[in-house]
């Protein structure tokens, strides 16, 4: 066997391994804009883990216009008419743009019924471990609940640990972006004045 070919194959294999996308845990998926898909990685990370724990991480090595999300989607049946919380400990390193947890509730006909991506209280820069949560009401007509983490319009790295999804009491504050703006009941300014 040719020694040069063997060394090249071994080195090539190492390079491929070093550049592989981190593996997402079972049940989790990745969604990204085209630019973020090329510039960002998402998956399991043990670099900060204690006691052998795994962390979920997103890293964008260069600035992006767009987003990358790691999430999972579950059936809403068990949670209809209830208030739910997705919570995690979050750590951020040099996040330009912003990051945060995200939760989305959708009906069977794909109407958005509830949404919070922490855009009104974003995590930016370098932040040590922080307890973070999103809380939404699950409408009776809800079909699915998606929840996870997003990095938007920037670069940096963010980690999640101690993830929890649970029903909470009705008096826990829900933070939802207003999905139903007040609209006029009749057409306005059709004369373009």
Regions found by a protein language model. Name each.
Residues 14-193:
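Extracellular and organelle-lumenal recognition/adhesion modules and their flexible linkers in secreted
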Residues 4-14:
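Bacterial N-terminal signal peptides
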């Amino acid at each position: 066997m040719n020694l040069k070919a063997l060394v090249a194959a071994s080195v090539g294999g190492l390079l491929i391994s070093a550049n592989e996308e981190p593996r997402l845990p079972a049940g989790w998926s990745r969604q990204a804009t085209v630019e973020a898909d090329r510039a960002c990685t998402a998956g399991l990370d043990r670099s900060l883990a204690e006691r052998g724990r795994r962390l979920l991480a997103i890293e964008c090595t260069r600035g992006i216009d767009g987003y990358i999300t790691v999430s999972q989607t579950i059936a809403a049946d068990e949670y209809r008419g209830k208030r739910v919380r997705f919570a995690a400990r979050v750590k951020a390193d040099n996040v330009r743009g912003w990051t945060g947890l995200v939760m989305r509730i959708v009906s069977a006909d794909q109407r958005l019924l509830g949404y919070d991506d922490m855009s009104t209280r974003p995590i930016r820069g370098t932040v040590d471990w922080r307890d973070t949560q999103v809380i939404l009401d699950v409408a009776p007509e809800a079909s699915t609940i998606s929840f996870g983490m997003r990095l938007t319009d920037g670069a940096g790295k963010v980690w999640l640990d101690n993830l929890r999804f649970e029903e909470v009491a009705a008096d826990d504050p829900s933070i939802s972006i207003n999905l139903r703006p007040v609209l006029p009941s009749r057409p306005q300014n059709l004369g373009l004045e």
